[in-house]
């Protein structure tokens, strides 16, 4: 099949677009993204959308700025709008590729949000999918990790990957036909990165298979397996939604409660997924916990009560009826912050400050045990408060408002020693992980 026809068919796979859609394409100047840009331009002749090409200058190599300029020159020649976004940093240590990827999505999706662009199209081709499968397999990934989705949301921006069944070799041939030169990133061939090591491993595997396997056949087999895994994952996702609705409550005060009896009726895969999501939401994490740790929590649930475990920045407490998950500060308590609009405390609570006249200096902090005696009588007279039905310890994870080191408000339990604060300052629970599956009580 002609690559342009194949690409247009793939775009139809993602469903109908709105009339004259606003589209962004992530283009680095490499084979994949340049071919993607030309294919989107061809497809757009019928759709009549507004295209913006976005290039990230990571400032990690001396050539990065000239490479962004090269993409800009091509866009000028084919009459596409181009914008270069800059990753400003003070030198990177640790996992450079992971940090660069995180920065890319942050910059790209922020630009899309600021310019009312819903669709961000990225170059993620068949070879990438095969390599990702093996990388995740080596890391012991579960069903969700081994399956592959070509459409998902980041920061409320719709990420589309339409090259999922097109190989890198086909993309190179297409660019040669269009007489477009591409940029070779030397890091793609560096053996210090796991992706390059996996690529070499696949080549050696094919050599050992001799004539029984070809590269294309291997890719097709793996993509077929991923289709089956994705279909199985969709089924599990439906189960997850069911048990999130009936067995889970997430409170806007930043903790979660699971009905143990109902939760045990779910499949192990659904339970692992739900626990993983809850630990990320409550613990202010962006990455899931390892399977082995979650397995320990699941086994503990079968036989224990009136005990607790610590995991992923959370305390997992077991009562006879419930599993209660709340924040564990450990040795790293969140810093106090001055109350003002849009300030985020503990990476989870955003401040809404509607004060107009009385602007006394207020701070957000956690409740210390030494502060508790000031509100003890209020707490004891409000035993029916739903939060206190689970664990009194949860109280010490709530954000409190202080003036001159004195607690004057704990909005989540409706405690106010100053009534003007009740009408003007509040908290909104906004964890790092946001999922359409979860709502807050």
UniProtKB/Swiss-Prot annotation:
Report the enzyme's class at the first EC level: ligase
The domain of life is Bacteria
Q: What is its EC number?
A: 6.3.4.19
**Binding annotation for ATP:** 28-33
Compartment(s) of residence = Cytoplasm
Which Gene Ontology terms of cellular component type are present?
cytoplasm
> Which Pfam families does UniProt cross-reference here?
ATP_bind_3
Q: Which UniProt keywords are given for this protein, alphabetically ordered? A: ATP-binding, Cytoplasm, Ligase, Nucleotide-binding, tRNA processing
Q: Molecular function terms in GO for this entry?
A: ATP binding; tRNA(Ile)-lysidine synthase activity
Show the catalytic activity.
cytidine(34) in tRNA(Ile2) + L-lysine + ATP = lysidine(34) in tRNA(Ile2) + AMP + diphosphate + H(+)
Entry-linked InterPro entries: Rossmann-like_a/b/a_fold, TilS/TtcA_N, tRNA_Ile_lys_synt, tRNA_Ile_lys_synt_N
Q: Which GO terms describe its biological process?
A: tRNA modification
Q: What is its main location?
A: cytoplasm
- What's the domain remark here? The N-terminal region contains the highly conserved SGGXDS motif, predicted to be a P-loop motif involved in ATP binding.
What is this protein for, i.e. what is its function? Ligates lysine onto the cytidine present at position 34 of the AUA codon-specific tRNA(Ile) that contains the anticodon CAU, in an ATP-dependent manner. Cytidine is converted to lysidine, thus changing the amino acid specificity of the tRNA from methionine to isoleucine.
Instruction: Give the family this protein belongs to, as stated in its UniProt record.
Output: Belongs to the tRNA(Ile)-lysidine synthase family.
> What's this protein's name?
tRNA(Ile)-lysidine synthase
Which organism is this protein's natural source? Answer: Orientia tsutsugamushi (strain Boryong)
